[in-house]
Amino acid sequence: MEAFAVIPVLDLRHGRVVRARAGQRQSYAPIETPLAKGSEPATIARALLAACPGPTLYVADLDAIMDGRAPDLPALERIARACPGVGLWVDAGFSDAAGLEAFLDSGLGRPVIGSESQRDARLVARLGQQMVLSLDSRGSERLGPAALHADARHWPDDVIAM
C-alpha cells in the first residue's frame, strides 16, 4: 500500500497568510484563526504545526502563482527559521528551468510543480526527486500536458492530486 500523508497548507498573498474561499483567489483575505494572532506567515506556520505536527508544510505563494512574481524568499526564510526540521514544499507557479534552479539554489525547500503550469513533461522528468508533482484538475478535466497525468515513470515519489 502506498503512503498517504496529511500536509498542512499556508496560502501567502501580499506577505500575509490568507484564508481560501472556494478557490476564488482574488477574494482571499488575511486569515483570522484561533491558532494565533495576526496573519504573519512564520507565526501562523508555527501555530499550525503545533496544532497539526508533521515533517512537512506546503506553502502556496499566490503572488508568484497569480502575478508571475518571484517566490517571496524573505517570507519563506522566516517560516523556515520558525519551523526548524520541517521541510517546505513551495508552490510558486514554477514553469521554467531558470526559476526552478534559482529556487533550488535558495535551499528553502522542494518546489511543487503544478501540471497546470507546464507546457510539456520534460521539466518534470529532468527534476526527478528534487520536486513534488501536483497533478491538477478542474472537475473531470486534467490540467496540463496529458503525458504528466498518464505516464508515472517520470513522477517523483511525492505526488499531490488536486
Roles of regions detected by a PLM:
Residues 2-6, 53-56, 84-88, 108-109, ...:
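Short, well-ordered coil/turn segments that N-cap beta-strands
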Residues 36-43, 88-90, 157-162:
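Short C-terminal domain-edge/linker segments immediately following a structured domain
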Residues 17, 21-70:
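N-terminal beta-alpha supersecondary unit
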Residues 41, 72, 96, 144-145:
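Amphipathic coiled-coil/heptad-repeat helices and related helical stalk/stem segments
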Residues 1-7, 38, 46-52, 56, ...:
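A structural preference for long, well-packed, hydrophobic secondary-structure segments
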Residues 50-51, 55-106:
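N-terminal active-site wall of soluble small-molecule enzyme domains
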Residues 9-34, 98-162:
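Conserved anion-binding
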Residues 46, 77, 150:
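Active-site phosphate/pyrophosphate- and oxyanion-stabilizing loops and adjacent acidic/basic residues
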